[in-house]
Amino acid sequence: GTGSFGRRFIETVLTRARPRKLIVFSRDELKQHEMQLDLAERFDPETLRCMRFFLGDVRDRERLSLAMRGVDIVIHAAALKQVPAAEYNPSECIHTNIMGAENVVRACLANQVRQVIALSTDKACNPVNLYGATKLASDKTFVAANNLSGDIGTRFAVVRYGNVVGSRGSVAPLFQRLSARGAAELPITDERMTRFWITLNQGVDF
């Protein structure tokens, strides 16, 4: 996709490999346009010949299935991840994070995709909010899909990250903005909390 992970992942693949086809599937046309412009500055036209950009939403199984034709590997990174927004809009979070995961599974099976990796979060472990609960349900959907692949042989896996430093919506950019404005204090939810951090590069390399 066109999020923090998706952009870095695409850049890494283009740098390290020569894929026959590399598809970006996301619902934000502006971010896709900006990503295309950014890639054009970083890579030569020959390297970018493999790139395809599909507008679509994981809620739309038919569009997903169309995008996955002839695809060997799928990385599923789409999610609504802002905790307060999820609590205020529970049905939207459920539709994207749970039903979207089910749509990805079915589209992958229909197209005989070889390998599927779903990105998840440590908040899915003993969840205390709706976001974590939806990601737990999503994780179980992907793991259980291994029982459905049959002779197709599609393998489904889930990787749970901690907080990714600098990703969209993470606390690091907020702290940077506040610090630049001369804030005397940085807000935290609870002084007893513990957060686990990885860099974006660590997430991609994993």
Task: Mark where each language-model region is.
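N-terminal Rossmann NAD(P)H-binding glycine-rich loop of SDR-like oxidoreductase domains
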Residues: G1-T15
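Conserved S-adenosyl-L-methionine
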Residues: T12-K21, Q112
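Conserved glycine-rich Rossmann-like NAD(P)H-binding loop of the short-chain dehydrogenase/reductase
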Residues: A17-E34
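Residues in the short beta-alpha loop(s) of Rossmann-like NAD(P)-binding domains
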Residues: D28, D38, D122
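NAD(P)-dependent short-chain dehydrogenase/reductase
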Residues: L130, L136-F206
